[in-house]
């Protein structure tokens, strides 16, 4: 089967063509290399159709993409980027003249654990302003603004880190993980607050942190990705190498004048409480709570921070986020939360030199 490189066909080639300098930089202590494979089989589907896959992105000083390749039969396959958030996306389309055949899309990348850094803000404020704005599922007025105002009123200072910590603590204390929610949740934060039901999964709980932070004047965003390896913290916060088709996870970060983008993950605190059957007061949970305000364990790969956005090329409607494969064939929309029904597997493996 002929192997092709997306790097040779896409306008984004320089983004994913790792230089010798970059490869050397990710060979040092603390870096781990992984391969992530999408194995797609849509051969049972008829009619014209399109497929979109979220891909790893280069991110800060904690994640570097080395290579993205594909093999199979995918007419017009290309690496694309949405024009607003820059989310890297694999796209393929079929005209209906023949059925799709099995396809594999592979990414090789390196990650290292991400602590809070000391970093000056960029002079260009465009990015900060973008991540203060509301979206369809993330309003920053009404009950969201009222709730944020009550929370930060109790903060001990006006510093963004202090106000963000007040919101983080409120999230940990008041939300809970609801295991019956499909996938990672929708992140409809107005509904959560108006209903008084603060249960959900990562895209609900961490979106609530982001929305409250924005309403309090703190730039913040979700980061969508998938777990690719075991955790050194709790077993439930990792995924053994192999089939990670259902290991998607959303995290969050906020912008600080002293530290740049600061990683947080209150949803994983609540996940550990539920799955480890430990109370918030347990010493291991208290330690995790402190750690996850300003730290990400990078047994996970970041895809993008796109929220309520249009795919490229456009799909029938905007998506709340792109963390799962997405496809449209004829009148059918394939739900990436059900890997077997969709026809895909995601497989991860650590690359050990």
Q: Can you name each region flagged by the protein language model?
A:
Residues 230, 234, 238-353:
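Active-site rim recognition segments
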Residues 43-59:
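Surface-exposed beta-strand/loop patches in extracellular or lumenal glycoproteins
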Residues 155-162, 170-250, 257, 272-275:
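Active-site neighborhood of thiol-dependent amide/isopeptide-bond enzymes
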Residues 80-82, 102-178, 182-196:
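Acidic low-complexity segments
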Residues 5-24:
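N-terminal export signals
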Residues 60-93:
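Solvent-exposed beta-strand/loop surfaces of large extracellular or lumenal domains
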Residues 18-46, 340-347, 352-353:
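C-terminal segment of N-terminal export signals and the immediately downstream linker at the start
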Residues 36-40, 51-53, 101-113:
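Short, hydrophobic/aromatic-enriched beta-strand segments in well-ordered soluble domains
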